[in-house]
């Protein structure tokens, strides 16, 4: 997924969410709509913002508690523990960061209906600070209001439309087949009948190869197993940028900048590298566009198509292209790695998914566009993986209007967070939540507003269709070609680094299927 946002390993208390004051209720609605009657209880029952439970009065003491619990690496667990302690809604303030936190799908529906015409998320203060420092334009990730809506609609109507994604499937397929070929070559080089490895960096290279092919219409040949310093520097800088962001959501970047702290230096340096590397592709594609030298039979790339449209000036296009490029690497790669890990841990599920793929291949004669429409269980693997390992552990919105959540009156302008990680592991929302079971998405369980790994509404992940297509196509080909295994005794848990990542290397064994 390309969506990046803030703020959840296992339930500390898997039993009840009930507290003396708050009973965890899902408020089901038969037609899944939220009427004004269901949103606005009588004045007699309505409570105020100050009545919401939570540790929000001692905000600076909370900083100490947050640090002591290693909150920067365990924000997902911190959030989960708070839901267990306070119930389905709690209020929190840590330093300057204040939010109302919710977990119910029905409350997520209300939150969605209250986001207004220009949905606004938490401001990524360090990213804004960097762009202000370097006098860079804001891209679609950081824009708000009318400017955001205008830019988003232009992007939505280009590459990110469903019709455009189908046009790009051959490009995805080409890169994915090269990746599969690379794995086969590694098996041959290993002089055994399998290859055992941590795929992290190879998946990063795959994601960079795909997104650059789409954005610039050009292959980088990153899957040739040759060390290439510039792309690797870009990949490493993305990781550093993510890692250095969380602390500056609680401590103002201006303070860290004023003392020239190491974390600020790392953050600025990583963004400098990201912009520098992206500019090499952007400027080359821009020159080709001006010279009209692009091969008219090849896919020209999103950049060229946006330039041809002329709806946005180049600097605005550049800003959003860099947003998309920087958000497409770790996010999609990490989700794919979690998928492989879970399928390796559950060989019976892997076998069923492989059978579905083989049957689809036979029916469609291997046509990738048709195959993408013929693998419902594999698509449920994506959903189930994002349930347990959401890229972003929460979705945030500043409410556009006064809203009622759990009988509390929440004023317009309040930041509300929906805890995705906590929701995915809640037994009152998902039956046997610790069990990896993709078929739950096929078997009649209520899934309304439960698959939110890409967000919701007009501000959901802009690259959702690209990410889903890339992940499903990759898994189609990998499971056709390889049996995936892992050490059953090694348990990998989650760590928060702005996105949710593995806390240790995921070592997998790939054995070619004869």
From Swiss-Prot:
Keyword annotations of the record: Cholesterol metabolism, Heme, Iron, Lipid metabolism, Membrane, Metal-binding, Mitochondrion, Mitochondrion inner membrane, Monooxygenase, Oxidoreductase, Steroid metabolism, Steroidogenesis, Sterol metabolism, Transit peptide
Secretion signal span: none
Transit peptide feature, positions: 1-39
Pathway connected to this protein: Lipid metabolism; C21-steroid hormone metabolism
Membrane topology: Peripheral membrane protein
Molecular function terms, GO-annotated: cholesterol monooxygenase (side-chain-cleaving) activity; heme binding; iron ion binding
Cellular-component GO terms for this entry: mitochondrial inner membrane
Biological processes, Gene Ontology terms: C21-steroid hormone biosynthetic process; cellular response to peptide hormone stimulus; cholesterol metabolic process; cortisol metabolic process; glucocorticoid biosynthetic process
Residues the record lists as binding heme: 461
EC number(s) on file: 1.14.15.6
Enzyme class, spelled out: oxidoreductase
CDD domains given in the database record: CYP11A1 (cd20643)
InterPro entries with a match to the protein in the record: CYP11_CYP27_families, Cyt_P450, Cyt_P450_CS, Cyt_P450_E_grp-I, Cyt_P450_sf
PROSITE patterns, alphabetized: CYTOCHROME_P450
Subcellular location as annotated: Mitochondrion inner membrane
Recorded catalytic activity of this chain's protein: 6 reduced [adrenodoxin] + cholesterol + 3 O2 + 6 H(+) = 4-methylpentanal + pregnenolone + 6 oxidized [adrenodoxin] + 4 H2O
Cofactor: heme
Main function: Catalyzes the side-chain cleavage reaction of cholesterol to pregnenolone, the precursor of most steroid hormones.
UniProt family annotation: Belongs to the cytochrome P450 family.
Name of the molecule in the record: Cholesterol side-chain cleavage enzyme, mitochondrial
Species for this entry: Hypanus americanus (Southern stingray)
